[in-house]
């Protein structure tokens, strides 16, 4: 899930768990395949594919798996024909939820997503019902041990930096316009500053803080959505209260 400051570290730990469960490779393969199908198999001329391949390599995906995923996308070898679909709705406590999926059976996927949402007390809405509450941005995470705030500001202002978030304990979050993400990455690489990840993110204009039962239900809902094989990304505008975080860490 893409969420915010207080529990960003928890999400990173969860991502490592997702990898152990084998979920991450499935999602990465789908993203590579779709990117190659939409923009061609040459990463030099297809920024989305280049980003997908970089993320796959960063997560230790074998080169042969990456090659086959690209070839499925370009039609060189047979494979499932994935379709991209976005769903919008509301979760516990009235939080806004955007779900991005890649599926070869949209009827199956919408039924499964609706079931997960409804059993958590949420509901699917119409297209556009909550997406207006978010902005699509380029996002890069950089460990605070590798660079200072001043260093990043100076380096990235000419490379499309829109915001530099510092409220996570261990990481800076660089936000750019989507079209400037590649420029920001290249500036960091030229300065030999390693980044944890680079991605397209949906940033909420405002967040809703959840506590108690709502926080627990929302976290379970997001976990269930992310565990679904067809779901690629889940975005919400929730923030978890300090008391709920303490309980989560017990």
From Swiss-Prot:
* Cellular component aspect of the GO annotation: cytosol
Kindly indicate whether the keyword Transcription belongs to this entry. yes
Keywords from the UniProt entry: Cytoplasm, DNA-binding, Transcription, Transcription regulation
Keyword Zinc annotated: no
Q: Specify where it is mainly localized.
A: cytoplasm
Transmembrane intervals: none
What compartments host this protein?
Cytoplasm
One GO BP: regulation of DNA-templated transcription
Give an example GO molecular function: DNA binding
What highest taxon heads this organism's lineage? Bacteria
Q: Do you know which InterPro entries this protein is assigned to?
A: Integrase-like_N, TACO1_YebC-like_2nd/3rd_dom, TACO1_YebC_N, Transcrip_reg_TACO1-like, Transcrip_reg_TACO1-like_dom3, YebC-like
Record family assignment: Belongs to the TACO1 family.
* HAMAP family reported for this sequence: Transcrip_reg_TACO1
By what name is this protein known?
Probable transcriptional regulatory protein Ctha_1786
Organism name: Chloroherpeton thalassium (strain ATCC 35110 / GB-78)
Taxonomy-wise, where does this protein's organism fall, top ranks first?
A: Bacteria, Pseudomonadati, Chlorobiota, Chlorobiia, Chlorobiales
């Amino acid at each position: 899930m893409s969420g915010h400051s207080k529990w960003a570290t928890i999400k990173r730990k969860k991502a490592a768990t997702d990898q152990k469960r084998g979920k991450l490779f499935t999602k990465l393969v789908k993203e590579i395949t779709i990117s190659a199908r939409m923009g061609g198999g040459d990463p030099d001329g297809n920024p989305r594919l280049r980003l997908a391949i970089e993320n796959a390599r960063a997560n230790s995906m074998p080169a042969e798996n990456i090659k086959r995923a690209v070839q499925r996308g370009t039609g060189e070898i047979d494979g499932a024909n994935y379709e991209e679909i976005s769903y919008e709705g509301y979760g516990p406590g009235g939080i806004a939820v955007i779900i991005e999926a890649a599926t070869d059976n949209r009827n199956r996927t919408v039924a499964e997503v609706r079931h997960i949402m409804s059993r958590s007390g949420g509901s699917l809405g119409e297209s556009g019902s909550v997406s207006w509450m978010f902005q699509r941005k380029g996002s890069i995470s950089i460990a605070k041990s590798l660079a200072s705030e001043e260093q990043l500001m100076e380096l990235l202002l000419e490379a499309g930096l829109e915001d530099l978030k510092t409220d996570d304990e261990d990481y800076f979050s660089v936000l750019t316009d989507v079209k400037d993400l590649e420029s920001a990455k290249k500036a960091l690489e030229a300065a030999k500053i390693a980044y944890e990840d680079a991605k397209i993110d949906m940033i909420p204009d405002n967040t809703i803080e959840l506590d108690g039962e709502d926080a627990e239900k929302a976290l379970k809902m997001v976990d269930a959505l992310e565990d679904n094989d067809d779901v690629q990304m889940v975005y919400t505008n929730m923030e978890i209260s300090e008391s709920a975080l303490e309980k989560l860490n017990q």
